[in-house]
């Protein structure tokens, strides 16, 4: 095909991303340093935040306080929460995609406090990313089991003070009953279905992670049915005063450990919102640590079909 064809072939292969490994991002198998392996031999920091201010009352958050928080938007409207794992990967709940599983229907908003940015908020729209792939755990069964999914973004995220990845670990044992765990989201704010009021800012709540024995005991009152498996855990207040609600699904539950933040759970399901003896139920990320790492390590960018057609034409050209 000649020197010119060979050059075009090399450029097309680079543009299509053929053979390029998926970015591993902010993963680790256990306690360690604050830097994690990233794509292309680079190292990336995770679990850091530069904004520490907290709005009085601990209900409404501040921009940049949770820089890994993502708003998953279905046809431009907030639908679920998520968390940034690396420049190309976002973690969320599988049940968010039960009826809407085409990547083209979704975008991911990062770095914004509000779930409804105004049309003239150019900063917000510059930090909105298209979704290339939605990878639901193959064993997902609604919201009850294996409620976890990964989104591969169509382009790389630019990090700044308001956009940073979260760390994850292969064990959550050390986080049970720790005082500094938080859940964030843009969901309803009362059991009666009160929506988030303007300016639709992210809300945060400090929660305690319960062990599964205690959680099953609470769910067995007044019935005698255990509902919490090892792939889940409960968090919140036993009196129902702190809980997640509709619209928070897929969002992160994170804990501080030695100055680094780790995502421990994904908002999954609950019995209504804010009910006594019915704490919120979360996907236990540690159970899926190796699945997450495998998907992120082995996925490759999807080539542009037009580029592949041109590539074939070059290969067959005299």
Curated annotation (Swiss-Prot):
Glycans are attached at residues 211, 284. It is a lipid-anchor; GPI-anchor. N-glycosylated. Residues 1-19 form the signal peptide. GO terms for molecular function: serine-type endopeptidase activity. The active site is at 95 (charge relay system), 147 (charge relay system), 249 (charge relay system). Disulfide bonds join 80-96, 181-255, 215-234, 245-273. Residues 55-297 form the Peptidase S1 domain. A lipid is attached at residue 299 (GPI-anchor amidated serine). It is found in: Cell membrane. One of its GO terms (biological process) is proteolysis. Keywords: Cell membrane, Disulfide bond, Glycoprotein, GPI-anchor, Hydrolase, Lipoprotein, Membrane, Protease, Serine protease, Signal. It is an enzyme of class 3 (hydrolase). The keyword Membrane applies. Residues 20-54, 300-318 form a propeptide. Its EC number is 3.4.21.-. One of its GO terms (cellular component) is intracellular organelle. Pfam families: Trypsin. InterPro entries: Peptidase_S1_PA, Peptidase_S1_PA_chymotrypsin, Peptidase_S1A, Trypsin_dom, TRYPSIN_HIS, TRYPSIN_SER. Belongs to the peptidase S1 family. This is Serine protease 41. It comes from Homo sapiens.
């Amino acid at each position: 095909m000649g020197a010119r064809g060979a050059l075009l072939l090399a450029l097309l292969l680079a543009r299509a991303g053929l053979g390029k490994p998926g970015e591993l991002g902010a993963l680790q198998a256990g306690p360690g340093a604050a830097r994690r392996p990233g794509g292309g031999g680079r190292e990336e920091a995770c679990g850091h935040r530069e904004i520490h201010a907290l709005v009085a009352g601990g209900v409404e958050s501040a921009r940049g306080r949770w820089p890994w928080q993502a708003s998953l938007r279905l046809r431009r409207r907030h639908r679920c929460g998520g968390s940034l794992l690396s420049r190309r990967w976002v973690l969320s709940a599988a049940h968010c995609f039960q009826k809407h599983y085409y990547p083209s229907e979704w975008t991911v908003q990062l770095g914004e406090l509000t779930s409804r940015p105004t049309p003239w908020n150019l900063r917000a729209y510059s930090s909105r990313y298209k979704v290339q792939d939605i990878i639901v755990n193959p064993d997902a069964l609604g919201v009850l089991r294996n409620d976890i999914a990964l989104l591969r973004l169509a382009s790389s995220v630019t990090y700044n003070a308001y956009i940073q990845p979260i760390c994850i670990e292969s064990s959550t044992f050390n986080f049970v009953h720790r005082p500094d765990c938080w859940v964030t989201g843009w969901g309803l704010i009362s059991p009666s279905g009160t929506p988030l009021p303007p300016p639709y800012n992210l809300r945060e709540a400090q929660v305690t992670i319960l062990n599964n024995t205690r959680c099953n005991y609470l769910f067995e009152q007044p019935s005698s049915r255990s509902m919490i498996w090892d792939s889940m855990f409960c968090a919140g207040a036993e009196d129902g005063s702190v809980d997640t609600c509709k619209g928070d699904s897929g969002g992160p539950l994170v804990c501080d450990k030695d100055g680094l933040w780790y995502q421990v759970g994904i908002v999954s399901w609950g019995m209504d919102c804010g009910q006594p003896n019915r704490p919120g139920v979360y996907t236990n990320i540690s159970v899926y640590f190796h699945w997450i790492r495998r998907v992120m390590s082995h996925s490759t960018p999807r080539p542009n079909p037009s580029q592949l057609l041109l590539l074939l034409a070059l290969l067959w050209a005299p």
